């Protein structure tokens, strides 16, 4: 039992509450929020290393042992995602200084960001489904506030769709959890794994599993449940879009990965095959969307959907290579989507438009921005040796090993189409005839580029430093592939 496990949740939660009382002092809010996020990175980094050297860390809150009490469990998969979340929180905060506007900043913006980070980290670390629901609600309430902050017409329109859709998904989550408790008498995920293997009610459990796949698919943006995503991520400022794009769909994917490698593993011939086909359709429709638009932000947003499909395929194939690849690609996508949203937001801020047809020749004025965008584009597409390559290659390798040749080829082909979709932005915006744009503001450009540059650097290091990263990813994959290790760590006391 390790009290350290709760700190990635507790620090942003307490910070969010304290930030509510600091709205009159903008500089204090910025400093405090940045410091809280930096401390979160340090704490999460220590947690990753502790899990690597000492194994899965658990904490039973209130002294109630599992499966009766609330348990937090940090395996390497959860710990790596918590660390990535903390990094994203810090960099989005830095980007916000120059992008969201003072009015939004004073309207409890930083408090909302910290509440969201607490909810995301809690969803990663919780050991039971009910508290996963609680943390989902915490991050969703924070996201409701952030998406409407500013009160523009498009924000109010898209937020209504976003809120209604998530209320429905949350209601279905409660129903699914209730059914599962009625059948098994427990909601602790480790205990559920044991009880389901002993229950013999495979048909009913499979139905509940499909219901939870629907719930997490709604939150993760899986076909055909992603229709809420493009508008909702497009409506708020770029900093909030970066936060949403890097984190929110990943929580849904994490939940799918956790429950379908730990709990619902009794009927993989049906559940995992269903996930494979949903993954393929998600990739196809994500690619179509990214090619159909000439709006910079919409192109980036639809590439989120493509990535969701790629990761889901890796989880569904469920081989050592594909699970490792899914973890690599999940972390890669969190980092590179953060960079791309920031770069797209910077591009829009400097040109005053999101339309590719109204951009051109920007490489002369903003060469650093141009080449940063190019590197982000090829990294997103998975061009070797950048970070997207390792994950996508391993996912395809696992798919080929399981005989999923057609969909594995689709995953590889999607790299070329993703590359084409984002290179359209690079070619139209930075090359060709220079279009009339607002007077250059190099001070603003630099302030916006620094956080994006750090994101891009981390993404490059993640790809080029595969040899250093792989032991951590391998350990994370091993726990997912051998759930008895997680079960033993949680139920041992």
Curated annotation (Swiss-Prot):
InterPro entries (UniProt xref): CPA3_Na-H_Antiporter_D, MnhD1, NADH_UbQ_OxRdtase, ND/Mrp_TM
Compartments where located: Cell membrane
A Gene Ontology BP annotation from the UniProt entry: ATP synthesis coupled electron transport
Keyword Transmembrane: yes
GO cellular component annotations of the record: plasma membrane
GO-annotated molecular function: NADH dehydrogenase (ubiquinone) activity; potassium:proton antiporter activity; sodium:proton antiporter activity
Superkingdom per UniProt: Bacteria
UniProt entry keywords in alphabetical sequence: Antiport, Cell membrane, Hydrogen ion transport, Ion transport, Membrane, Sodium, Sodium transport, Transmembrane, Transmembrane helix, Transport
Other notes: Mrp-dependent antiport apparently occurs by a secondary, proton motive force-dependent mechanism, but the similarity of several Mrp proteins to membrane-embedded subunits of energy-coupled NADH dehydrogenase complexes raises the possibility that there is a capacity for electron transport that could provide a primary energy coupling option for Mrp functions.
Role this protein plays: Mrp complex is a Na(+)/H(+) antiporter that is considered to be the major Na(+) excretion system in B.subtilis. Has a major role in Na(+) resistance and a minor role in Na(+)- and K(+)-dependent pH homeostasis as compared to TetB. MrpA may be the actual Na(+)/H(+) antiporter, although the six other Mrp proteins are all required for Na(+)/H(+) antiport activity and Na(+) resistance. MrpA is required for initiation of sporulation when external Na(+) concentration increases. Also transports Li(+) but not K(+), Ca(2+) or Mg(2+).
Family from the record: Belongs to the CPA3 antiporters (TC 2.A.63) subunit D family.
Subunit structure: Forms a heterooligomeric complex that consists of seven subunits: MrpA, MrpB, MrpC, MrpD, MrpE, MrpF and MrpG.
Protein name: Na(+)/H(+) antiporter subunit D
Species per Swiss-Prot/TrEMBL record: Bacillus subtilis (strain 168)
Organism ancestry: Bacteria, Bacillati, Bacillota, Bacilli, Bacillales
This protein's encoding gene: mrpD
């Amino acid at each position: 039992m390790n009290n350290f496990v709760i700190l990635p949740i507790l620090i942003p939660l307490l910070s969010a509450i304290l930030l509510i009382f600091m709205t009159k002092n903008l500089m204090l809010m910025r400093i405090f929020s940045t410091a809280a996020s930096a401390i979160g990175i340090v704490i999460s980094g220590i947690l990753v290393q502790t899990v690597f050297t000492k194994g899965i860390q658990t904490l039973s809150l209130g002294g109630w042992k599992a499966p009766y009490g609330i348990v937090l469990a940090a395996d390497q998969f959860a710990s790596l995602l918590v660390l990535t979340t903390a990094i994203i929180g810090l960099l989005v905060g830095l980007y916000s200084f120059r992008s969201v506007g003072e009015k939004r900043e004073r309207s409890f913006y930083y408090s909302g960001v910290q509440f969201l980070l607490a909810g995301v980290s809690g969803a990663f670390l919780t050991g039971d489904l009910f508290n996963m629901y609680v943390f989902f609600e915490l991050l969703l309430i924070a996201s409701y506030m952030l998406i409407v902050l500013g009160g523009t017409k498009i924000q109010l329109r898209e937020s209504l769709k976003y809120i209604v859709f998530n209320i429905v998904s949350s209601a279905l989550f409660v129903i699914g959890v209730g059914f599962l408790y009625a059948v098994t008498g427990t909601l602790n995920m480790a205990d559920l794994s044991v009880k389901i293997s002993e229950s013999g009610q495979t048909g009913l459990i499979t139905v509940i599993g499909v219901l939870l796949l629907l719930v997490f698919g709604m939150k993760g943006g899986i076909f055909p449940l992603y229709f809420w995503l493009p508008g909702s991520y497009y409506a708020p400022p770029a900093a909030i879009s970066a936060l949403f794009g890097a984190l929110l769909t990943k929580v849904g994917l994490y939940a799918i990965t956790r429950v379908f490698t730990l709990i619902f593993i009794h009927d993989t011939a049906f559940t995992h095959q269903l996930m494979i086909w949903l993954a393929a359709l998600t990739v196809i429709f994500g690619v179509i969307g990214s090619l159909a638009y000439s709006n910079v932000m919409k192109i980036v947003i639809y590439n989120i959907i493509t990535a969701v499909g790629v990761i889901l395929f890796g989880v569904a194939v469920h081989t050592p290579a594909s699970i490792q690849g899914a973890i690599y690609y999940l972390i890669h996508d969190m980092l590179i989507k953060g960079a791309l949203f920031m770069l797209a937001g910077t591009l829009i801020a400097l040109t005053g438009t999101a339309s590719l047809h109204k951009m051109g020749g920007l490489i002369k004025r903003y060469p650093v921005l141009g080449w940063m965008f190019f590197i982000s584009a090829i990294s997103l597409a998975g061009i070797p040796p950048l970070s997207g390559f390792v994950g996508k290659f391993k996912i395809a390798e696992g798919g080929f090993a399981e005989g999923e040749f057609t969909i594995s080829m689709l995953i590889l082909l999607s790299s070329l189409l993703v590359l084409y979709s984002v290179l359209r932005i690079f070619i139209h915006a930075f090359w060709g005839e220079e279009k009339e744009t607002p007077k250059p503001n190099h001070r603003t450009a630099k302030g916006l580029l620094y956080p994006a540059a750090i994101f891009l650097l981390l993404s490059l290091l993640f790809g080029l430093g595969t040899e250093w990263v792989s032991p951590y990813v391998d350990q994370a994959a091993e726990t997912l592939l051998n759930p008895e290790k997680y079960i033993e760590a949680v139920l041992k006391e």
